[in-house]
Regions:
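Mature N-terminal segment immediately following signal peptide/propeptide cleavage
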Residues: 64-106
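C-terminal motif of bacterial Sec signal peptides marking the signal peptidase cleavage site
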Residues: 24-27
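Non-catalytic, conformational "gating/processing" segments within enzyme and secreted inhibitor domains
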Residues: 213-214, 243-279, 477-480, 487
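An aromatic/glycine/proline-enriched structural segment found at the starts
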Residues: 57, 62, 223, 227, ...
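Post-signal peptide N-terminal segment of mature Sec-exported envelope proteins
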Residues: 34-71
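M16 family metallopeptidases and their MPP-like homologs
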Residues: 88-90, 94-127, 133-181, 194, ...
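N-terminal secretory signal peptides that target proteins for export/translocation
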Residues: 1-11
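Bacterial signal peptide processing site
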Residues: 29-31
Length: 538
C-alpha cells in the first residue's frame, strides 16, 4: 500500500515556508552560525535513555518447514505368465509411457572359468539382430517407434530394457520379445562387437578409476571367486570367447522360468498379460533342469595392507580404503545406507567436506557399498592431485578412524534420514527409474515388497544403530589401501603405516611383484594427524 502525501492547506503553507527560507539562505551566502548552547546536564538520579527498539517484522517470525513425511513405496502386483516367467507390475497412468526391464540371474558370476566376460558378451549380442531382422533393420525398427531397447550386465544378472510411448507399446513389445527370446547371434556381427569390446578393454587400462574398480575385485575376492573378475572380462579372457560360447551360454542361462519381467507405467494387468501371450508364447523352457543361481561365499583373507598400481608421471592418483561388505539381503543394509551417506555418500558428507572443501586435495571424496546377491564391498576413495597423495591418504584414514570410533552426530542422524526419504521419492518419479530399480531388486533375489519394508527400517534407525554399523564396517584398521598412482609419492604414508613395501599389481589386478606388504608391528591404525588446512589468503 502506498502512503499518500498530505494535501491540507496547513501542510501546503508549511512546505512553502520551508522552501522560501531555504532559497533566501542560499541566495545570501553562508552565515556564521551562533554557538550552540551547552546541553543541560541530567540530574544525577536520571536514568539513561532506553535503546531504540529493534524493528519488528510485520510478518512475524519465519516458520520452520516441517520435516518431509516418510514415503512408503508401493508394492508391485505379481503374477506368472505363460512359460513360467515371473511378472512384477506397478501401474502409473499419469503419463502415457511404459518401461519394462527383464532380468535373468546370469551375470559375471555365472561366467565359466577362463571365460570372464561371457555373460556380458551374450547380453551385448541380444540386440545385434533378432527375429526376422538383422542388426541394422532391428535398430531402424526400434527408432521408427520412438522406443529404446538396451542391454546390461552386472555381477549377478543380465538385463534387457524397453521404454516406449503407450501408443507404440504393442509393436515395440514384439521387438522386445525378439531381442530376449529370438536373438540371431550372427558370426559377422559378433566379430564386429568383439573388436569393439577388445578396444574398450584396452582403453580401460588408461582410466585410473576403471582400473581401481577392477583391482578392488581382484584384491578382495581373488581370481578364483565368482566376483573376482570385472563384469566385462579382461583382455586375456575376451580373446578366448567365440560365438559358439555365446550360443551355449544363452541356451543354458536364458530361459523363461528363470526370468523376471518388471513393468511400470501406463499399462494394466490384462493388457500386459495379453502382450506376453502374443509375443512370448513361443519362448519355452527346455526340459533340462533349471541352473542353480550363483550365490558366492564371503571372501576370505588375509588381504594385503597396501596395493599399488604404479602409474609413473600420472597427474592424479586414486586412493581408496577397501573392506568386505554384506549381501543385499543382510539386515544391516537399511542402516548402512544412512551410515554411508554420513561418511561419504553425498556432497555434505565428512570425507568430501574435509578432503575437498577444507583441504582442496580433490574435486570429490566418496564412499559406497555394493549391492550383490553374495558379499559386497565397501570402499572409500578420492582422486587427488599426485603430489598430495600421501597427505590425502593420511586425511582419509584419519576421517575413517574418527568416524568408526566416534560414530555419527545428531545432525548426521537427522540429515541422513531426510536424504533417505528424498532419494526414495526420486526413484519413483519416472516409470523408467521405477522399472530399473525394481528389476535390480528382483535380480538380487529380493521380494517385491523389499523397498517398502526397507524404507521403513532405514527411516527408523537410531543413532546407536548407526554408531554400531560405523564401527563394524568403516573402521580402516584391518582394511586394504589401494592406490593407482606413482610409487614415489606414497612413501611417506607407507612409513607412517609401518608398511615396508606395497603389493604391486597390474591394471587387471594381477600380482606382478612378490613383495608382500608386511606391517612393522602394527595394523593400519590411525596415522599421524594430517596437517590442518591453512586459512584462505587473498
Amino acid at each position: 500500500m502506498k502512503l499518500r502525501a498530505s494535501s491540507s492547506p496547513a501542510a501546503v503553507a508549511l512546505v512553502g515556508a520551508v522552501v522560501a527560507s531555504s532559497w533566501v539562505s542560499t541566495a545570501c551566502g553562508p552565515s556564521t552560525p551562533a554557538p550552540a548552547a551547552p546541553a543541560p546536564e541530567p540530574p544525577p538520579s536520571a536514568a539513561p535513555a532506553p535503546p531504540a527498539s529493534a524493528a519488528v517484522d510485520p510478518l512475524g517470525p519465519k516458520p520452520e518447514p516441517p520435516a518431509p513425511p516418510p514415503f512408503l513405496p508401493p508394492t508391485p502386483d505379481v503374477f506368472t505368465a505363460t512359460g513360467g516367467m515371473t511378472v512384477w507390475l506397478l501401474e502409473r497412468h499419469q503419463v502415457p509411457i511404459v518401461s519394462c526391464d527383464l532380468t535373468i540371474p546370469a551375470g559375471a558370476s555365472s561366467d565359466p572359468k577362463g571365460k570372464g566376460g561371457l555373460a556380458y558378451a551374450t547380453a551385448t549380442m541380444l540386440d545385434e539382430g533378432a527375429g526376422k531382422r538383422g542388426a541394422i533393420a532391428l535398430s531402424s525398427a526400434i527408432d521408427d517407434l520412438g522406443a529404446r531397447i538396451s542391454t546390461d550386465t552386472n555381477a549377478d544378472a543380465s538385463f534387457v530394457s524397453l521404454t516406449v510411448l503407450k501408443r507404440n507399446l504393442e509393436s515395440s513389445f514384439a521387438l522386445f520379445s525378439d531381442v530376449v527370446a529370438r536373438p540371431r547371434f550372427e558370426p559377422a556381427e559378433f566379430a564386429r562387437v568383439k573388436d569393439l569390446w577388445q578396444n574398450e578393454l584396452k582403453s580401460r587400462e588408461k582410466d585410473p578409476d576403471a582400473t581401481a574398480r577392477v583391482v578392488y575385485r581382484a584384491v578382495l575376492f581373488g581370481a578364483e571367486h565368482p566376483y573376482g573378475h570385472p563384469w566385462d572380462g579382461t583382455a586375456a579372457s575376451a580373446k578366448t570367447i567365440a560365438i559358439e560360447d555365446v550360443k551355449s551360454f544363452y541356451a543354458k542361462q536364458w530361459r523363461p522360468d528363470r526370468a523376471t519381467l518388471v513393468c511400470a507405467g501406463d499399462v494394466t494387468k490384462p493388457e500386459l498379460a495379453h502382450l506376453l501371450d502374443e509375443s512370448f508364447s513361443s519362448w519355452k523352457a527346455p526340459s533340462t533342469p533349471v541352473p542353480a543361481g550363483v550365490v558366492p561365499e564371503a571372501p576370505k583373507g588375509p588381504w594385503p595392507k597396501v596395493v599399488l598400481v604404479d602409474r609413473k608421471d600420472a597427474p592424479q592418483a586414486v586412493i581408496a580404503v577397501l573392506r568386505p561388505g554384506v549381501s543385499a539381503a543382510d539386515p544391516a543394509v537399511p542402516g548402512l545406507w544412512r551410515v554411508n551417506d554420513a561418511i561419504g555418500g553425498s556432497f555434505s558428507s565428512r570425507l568430501n567436506q574435509d578432503l575437498r572443501e577444507a583441504r582442496g586435495y580433490t574435486y570429490g571424496a566418496r564412499s559406497r557399498y555394493s549391492m550383490s546377491r553374495g558379499p559386497g564391498q565397501i570402499v572409500s576413495w578420492a582422486n587427488v592431485v599426485t603430489d598430495k597423495t600421501s597427505p590425502a591418504l593420511d586425511a582419509l584414514l584419519d576421517d575413517l578412524h574418527k568416524f568408526a570410533d566416534g560414530g555419527v552426530t545428531e545432525d548426521e542422524v537427522a540429515r541422513t534420514r531426510s536424504q533417505a526419504r528424498g532419494e526414495i521419492v526420486n526413484v519413483y518419479e519416472s516409470v523408467e527409474a521405477i522399472a530399473g530399480h525394481l528389476a535390480g531388486d528382483a535380480s538380487l533375489g529380493l521380494p517385491p515388497d523389499w523397498e517398502a519394508t526397507t524404507s521403513q527400517k532405514r527411516d527408523a534407525a537410531q543413532r546407536a544403530d548407526l554408531d554400531a554399523l560405523a564401527k563394524q564396517y568403516y573402521d580402516p584398521t584391518n582394511a586394504t589401501i589401494v592406490v593407482v598412482g606413482p610409487l614415489g609419492v606414497l612413501q611417506a604414508s607407507l612409513d607412517k603405516l609401518g608398511v615396508s613395501a606395497p603389493e604391486m599389481r597390474d591394471s587387471e589386478g594381477n600380482v606382478i611383484a612378490a613383495k608382500a606388504a608386511k606391517p612393522a608391528g602394527k595394523p593400519l591404525g590411525p596415522p599421524a594427524a594430517p596437517p590442518a588446512p591453512k586459512p584462505a589468503t587473498k
